[in-house]
Amino acid sequence: MRLPDETKRLAIVGATGSGKTQAALWHLSMRDIDRRPWIVYNFKDDRSIDSIPQKRDIEIDELPLKPGVYVTHPQPNQTDEVEAQMWAIWEKQGIGVYVDEGYMVGPNNPAFRAMLTQGRSREIPIIVLSQRPVWMDRFVFSESEFFQVFRLNHKRDRKSVEEFVPADLSQRLPDYHSYYYDVGENKVTILKPVPSIQQIHRRFDQRLSAIRKTI
């Protein structure tokens, strides 16, 4: 099974409590956080994100340049500020982006779409999460090379994802299991639960502690 590389886009969807955030953090802990900055948009103030060891909090108008994990907490009324920061990321290039929750970016954010459509050439890897994919910008799905799909409670959400993922999402998997779709290989794999959040946080701590010693 392939994992996304430094230029790929990954969409992770699932209902609240399905395991998507833990899976997304596992993916992030495996990415190149020791070689580039990753900006995490924590719209929902998720505690598992805010508890990442060695992460740094930044304001919505900051643009980190050194490797590591940087968390920002946009308010619902800061869509213009989010767009401005995303344009700065697009212009700078070489910065990873993690968005939780995807639909809170806004349905018509041109900077977000630019990163999705041009992220590969500009080396902007992206991880986007959503509990309601039917509300999310369709460019997230059309441009993603990898999908991870957990339990979705709403039929409209399942149908929305099935337009891009060749799996019968009405067939419920065991708790915390997911469908993993590699678009390039046109291959669907059923994944077991990812490691515990404690194990994931330890991996962050190990990797980020090492780069803090060199910065």
Task: List where the protein language model places each region.
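Conserved P-loop NTPase motor cores
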Residues: 10-29, 75-167
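Walker A/P-loop NTP-binding active-site region of P-loop NTPases
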Residues: 18-58
